[in-house]
């Protein structure tokens, strides 16, 4: 599908608050050029500012909460809308996310109603130079449509990008590009996008999100094995461990392109992954395929930073 063919339809009755994760810790692997990625410039603009501006321009977004080093964030986001709230970081990813969730909940509390666990929030990373208001609105609309179609109040929607939406960012005609590994499902090749819609209070095992984030680089077998080990002893852990190893083995088999690969891929369904993730997280999970591949192109390392800067003018119009 062409990203221009957006499906802007009625989503939820009210706009969603957005949480932008712009925090950092002392781990140098989380930084690029020794810096918090939020404050890098791509295309002549600081990344976190670019993300915030896209969110503020999206019709489906209400308030935007940015969590990170508050003093530095105020400097680069000075002069932005009253719909922007800066939240000081308190620790690692999950702790920072909850600091922003609490700030959002505090803004919507009224009388004795208390916190509404059914209220969805958008959660997104700060280092997405190819984000746009249209892409954000489209993703939220797809989440709402999936929910309406199944009559299920999902706890978590996770964005995934398909190969067709990422081919345009490959190296071509002597120009640099970005090509990353995919998860090989029976119907398509997918990779995670850095955008989610969540009802965080409906996830009873949220602590696993931090574990998954720490070991998310599946191209490193040490991370894969560490992730699999973290599953064991949890509800649904053995099934999730087996599925993770199967998906990784399918990726390895794809390099040979023979019968074993075709057989393994045939059994890899997105629905199985959704059920396994839901069991681990203690909630219902739905993966949403976005036609906007830019959600998957974060500034992962210094090479990505260089390529995204070099190709920004070409790619920002896609």
Predicted segments, located by residue:
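Conserved core of the sugar-phosphate nucleotidyltransferase
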Residues: 133-278, 290-293
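Short, acidic, metal-binding catalytic loop of nucleotide-sugar glycosyltransferases
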Residues: 54-61
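N-terminal nucleotide-binding beta1-loop-alpha1 segment
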Residues: 1-33
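ATP/nucleoside-binding phosphotransfer catalytic cores, i.e., glycine-rich phosphate-binding loops
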Residues: 271-318
